[in-house]
Amino acid sequence: IKNGAPFDILLAADAKTPAKAVAEGHGVAGTPFTYAVGKLVLWSSDANLVKNDVAAVLNSANVKHVAIANPKLAPYGEAAYQTLKSLGLEKAVEGKTVLGDNIGKTYQFVKTGNAEAGFIALSQCFKDGKFVSGSGYVIPQDLYSEIKQDAVLLKKGENNEGAKRFLKFLKESQEATAIRDAYGYGTARSRAELTERYC
């Protein structure tokens, strides 16, 4: 985008990047909004590994590697470390942590078995109200800062009516909300609702 790539819209994994795009003159002022709120999950490709006890998983002798996105680069990594701190489990992952450059690489570590478990985005392993494979536990949202994912209309799309309509669809459409919910995104929910719905 900084180098002039012909993109009309940016859908970011955080709120900072769209705000920065506007501040640097690449995004249209007044257009950033939160299109989704990400959820953090402790997930394993092993269908029997993860129950509802994060400490038991991380302290398990069977868990030699725990994948986490680099907290300096990825909001989900930052959320994972906040969760560990909130639960007093920082020492449980010492010597076990495998850092991914982004949440996609972190997911691949776990999916391929290079890490027995990992903190990833719920949307990576969840569809239509259930885990697609493996086992997971949705981390209660009160253990980490909300992962707001913002969208922004870029300057190159300022006169693109299709781009504006798409952003309006994301922001206002019940259909867009249903799609987000099906993949584990949405607006902030209470801990009780998350536990009842996803666990």
Where are these regions (language model features)?
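Periplasmic-binding protein-like
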Residues: F7-A12
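Exported/periplasmic ABC-transporter solute-binding proteins
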Residues: K2-N3, D14-A15, A19-G25, A36-G38, ...
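Active-site phosphate-binding/coordination module
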Residues: G30
